[in-house]
Swiss-Prot record:
NCBIfam families xref list: PRK00099.1-1
Subunit structure: Part of the ribosomal stalk of the 50S ribosomal subunit. The N-terminus interacts with L11 and the large rRNA to form the base of the stalk. The C-terminus forms an elongated spine to which L12 dimers bind in a sequential fashion forming a multimeric L10(L12)X complex.
Any one annotated GO CC term: large ribosomal subunit
Protein name (Swiss-Prot/TrEMBL): Large ribosomal subunit protein uL10
The gene coding this protein: rplJ
Amino acid sequence: MVKKIREKKKIAVDELTDALAVAQSAVFTDYRGISTSELTTIRMKLREAGVGYRVLKNTLARRAADNTDHANIKSAFEGPVAMAYSSSDVVAPAKVLMDYLAGSKSTLKVTGGYLSNKLISVEEVAELAKLPSREVLISKVLAGMQSPIAGLAMVLNGPARGLAVVLQARMKQLEG
């Protein structure tokens, strides 16, 4: 019996270690007073955005943090803690949770977050949530890069277009 419990805890630590290792960012929440249906709704919204959400056992979470290069986040694991994390979009966990909290009367509390190998405050999580998503930022950069190229193409085509107009006018002059 004790072996099975230890085995389950080891599996839980390994899974959490993997989650922490790939997480680009994380938001920590205090889920006291949350009903199961509300927690399910939160999980569903996070999952739709590609964000994982785990309720953590603090001791196991600290062990998992020790197994990664994120050992500095151990202080976040106090009280009832759940973690929303993403391996692809840094903004998504903060944005989804803050949008949910703004549109509901939930008792869920954001207690802090993790970004770029450091803990961030609740205020910094709120600021992070205001940033556009990764896809929007990439499209803005690409649009900014495309504008000068399009302008250059227009400038380079200008003399050729002018020459074509002059030649066409000369042809009409010779015909008529």
